Amino acid sequence: LLEQISDLYEEHKAEQNHEKKREIYRKIDEVSQEASKYAIANEYDKAISSLGASGTNAHTWFDETVYKNNIPNNELEKWLKIERERFSGMVLRLFHTELESVYEEFNRAQDNDSRLVNYELMDALFPLHPNGQQTTLGKAEHLRNPSMKAIHKYFDEYYVPNNYAFVLVGDLDFDATITLIDKYFGSLPYSELPPKNKIVEKPITEIVKRT
């Protein structure tokens, strides 16, 4: 079912006729309803909460995606087991409903004056660089035409062990903690990252005004 949903999103993205796009989206709704019978809502939160975790959250910014948890030190190994499973492969369960949550956040941002000012500022500072031309939330057309295949491709390319780091603080035995991390993450293979394109911005030599 997930593969079928993924294919439907690709079909929806490629279709130019608005009526046909609506028909495809109705099919996505239908198949997603069927797929939801095999998914557990908030599965990760439930698993983490069972360890006594608190403060579970995440944020994304220009150069980082950060996942946060407060874990009791006696549950560290169980937490690592869960994270190893999560970072070993991605399954986009309940993608349809999660997309709606992102839409809501995107819509709220359109009425947030501080965000709108920041968008204009970054656009003026970086007319060529993605930091100025691509907001963290993306553009409306991105959300209207999502691609599960593109998300999987991004995960496979960037969610690799040589591109992320653990930051652990608290009442920890350093040597034992490193041993546990090696146990669960040490076997994940190194993967070359996609090449970076160097973007050179021209110096700002005059006042830039936006209204």
Q: What are these regions, as identified by a protein language model?
A:
Residues N69-L99:
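M16/insulysin-pitrilysin zinc metalloprotease superfamily fold
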